[in-house]
Amino acid sequence: MSLLVVGLNHQTAPTSLLERTSVSAEDIPKVLHDLAEGTHVSEAVVLSTCNRIEIYAEVETFHGGVADISDQLSRICGIDLGDLAGHLYVHHEARAIGHLFSVVCGLDSMLVGESQILGQVRTAFRAGQAAGVAGSALSGLFQAALRVGKRAHSETSIDAAGASIVSVGVRLAASGLGLHSEVPAVPVAPPGGRALDGGGVAAEGPRHAVTPEPPPLAGTRVLLIGAGAVGSLAAQTVRRAGAGEVVIANRTAARAARVAEAHEARVVGLTDLAHEITMADLVISSTGASGLVVEHELVAAALPGRAGRPLVFLDLALPHDIDPGVRELPGVSLIDLDALRIALDGAQVTHDVEAVRALVAAEVASFLDRRRAGRVAPTVVALRAHAAAVVRSELARLHTRLPDLDDREWSLVEGSVRRVVDKLLHAPTVRVQELAGAPGGDAYAEALRELFDLPREVPAVVSAPDLDLLERS
């Protein structure tokens, strides 16, 4: 049995392919049961978000597990496996554990450091549990991953890294509008500390009088479509960039109102998009809609009222919110996630990202030690149960041969036999648990099973006199 993850994400697949991979919450139980009914997958969890689809599994065999999961992903995407294979990644054991820990910390997200993935991983795990397909192996893995994710966000300022993609998008948008394009970094308070500036240094007041650069979005009107985590971050970013007016359109008015209150914005309904696009300079969209939110015809109808002013769309959604065809319209620019991915290729890795990577590495090592020790525990229990049975049998035989011993004498004999057996077992059982943490540690447990002809199933019931032998290790 081993851990395995097979999937594709924004780093391995184009946006056009990722748009076809989403699995609804209603369909996940069927996907899980289809996997479990195969011969190679014993446990499974499906993680499906805007930027990835991954199947984590405990598998009987590596190659069989990869084949079963890859076939399932092919069916989900509606793409021939031969065409899909080039976009898939496969991680096994330590690399699978490290991948999940990195994902839950936001290190593998398009928006690095974003915390929404923590809730998405929790939801995926609960769906696996509800379907009865996430057993003890994946339960231990996902519970550990969620703890690591919480530590990353509470003990570091990894959230600050998440602001980078929005800041880069706004910088590109300001450039598209012909404006100064240096966007101030969004300050993020470190755990127990002051707000950090863009370089990770506690911000202080200026020491010398300087002539400030004009805000990159000074005097502009910004329309935000979507009020989720990315939309809220976008509102904060454009406000710091000096936007003159911020308008928020969202399907849920109450959520939009909360974001608007925090960032001095105005709320409109989605039915008002045509008018608001006519008035806006920059439109940033980040909804979770399954189809287009802003279509070509809607934008074309808004252009006559703009008097030739440039209009920039920043599409942070996946699947796309903005019709790619708007690029063909005069005076209209579109910046999408693919463009942002290129712009971010050379971005400097922040100190907090490195801190989280170190945290992940340490937690992976700790989890592997626990996992290996857990694998050898049944062998230790079986060995001590076997020894206890032998002691019990031999003491019974000895008792019939020495019927004249009184209780005190018999107690001394019984104690001596048990101590001898316990001392003989102590070194091998302790050593095999130590060796279990090393690569190939399972082989030592298997050797004990073969040498002592131990059963594969751990005894469920042990009599009270044998408890000492079973519990010592």
Curated annotation (Swiss-Prot):
Residues 196-215 are annotated as: Disordered. The keyword Oxidoreductase applies. The active site is at residue 50. NADP(+) binds at residues 226-231. Keywords: NADP, Oxidoreductase, Porphyrin biosynthesis. GO terms for biological process: protoporphyrinogen IX biosynthetic process from glutamate. Pfam families: GlutR_dimer (PF00745), GlutR_N (PF05201), Shikimate_DH (PF01488). Substrate binds at residues 49-52, 109, 114-116, 120. One of its GO terms (molecular function) is NADP binding. It catalyses: (S)-4-amino-5-oxopentanoate + tRNA(Glu) + NADP(+) = L-glutamyl-tRNA(Glu) + NADPH + H(+). Disulfide bonds: none annotated. Its EC number is 1.2.1.70. Gene3D superfamilies: Glutamyl-tRNA reductase, N-terminal domain (3.30.460.30), NAD(P)-binding Rossmann-like Domain (3.40.50.720). Pathway: Porphyrin-containing compound metabolism; protoporphyrin-IX biosynthesis; 5-aminolevulinate from L-glutamyl-tRNA(Glu): step 1/2. Catalyzes the NADPH-dependent reduction of glutamyl-tRNA(Glu) to glutamate 1-semialdehyde (GSA). Belongs to the glutamyl-tRNA reductase family. Possesses an unusual extended V-shaped dimeric structure with each monomer consisting of three distinct domains arranged along a curved 'spinal' alpha-helix. The N-terminal catalytic domain specifically recognizes the glutamate moiety of the substrate. The second domain is the NADPH-binding domain, and the third C-terminal domain is responsible for dimerization. During catalysis, the active site Cys acts as a nucleophile attacking the alpha-carbonyl group of tRNA-bound glutamate with the formation of a thioester intermediate between enzyme and glutamate, and the concomitant release of tRNA(Glu). The thioester intermediate is finally reduced by direct hydride transfer from NADPH, to form the product GSA. Homodimer. This is Glutamyl-tRNA reductase. The lineage of its organism: Bacteria, Bacillati, Actinomycetota, Actinomycetes, Frankiales.
